[in-house]
Amino acid sequence: PLMLYAMGQTHALAQLQATHTIAMVGSRNPTPQGQINARDFARNLSASGLTIVSGLALGIDGAAHEGALLGAVMRNAAPTQLPTVAVVGTGLDRVYPRQHRDLAHQIAQQGLILSEYPLGTPPLRANFPKRNRLISGLSQATLVVEAALPSGSLITAKQALEQGRDVLAIPGSIHATQSKGCHWLIKQGAKLVESAQDVLEELQLPVWS
């Protein structure tokens, strides 16, 4: 983008490109297990030193941000280490969805909120798919936690591949609608991961214990 607006720990923005980062995306209407997986993966990856990038949406995004903040507590993160980055599709003065107002405040206190849209920009439907390229572009890899067919998360995965990033996916039940997108990605060559340790190994990073 021509311009990027930032709110939060902006002093750490310059170090973001040198930080190990992973995008975590998925359904806005996840299964209970998907919600748990997102939070647990994010917590353990954050505790291992990774920055979790997501989009502050309901469902998987929110759970990933929450897990990342918990993981930062576990590793006693230094002020220059960002636990999580939220890339939003509105102006920074608009929190969307409203249910994530408190979460957005926590992210601004400990991490970063980024937007390519100027202040005052409302939550326009077209903006959210556009911001997905920033979520994947800021990350070494994209992890799809749960996704139906079709899904905006698959757009993010496609953009990650176009940007030369790895795509990882968590499998689920063959009967679960919210796992069909992940299964499709795995068939297309995405790396199947069952734990945070699997993710670290795929990224060739030390396994946290």
Residues of each region from the PLM?
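Glycine-biased, small-residue-rich flexible motifs in mid-sequence functional cores and linkers
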Residues: 1-209
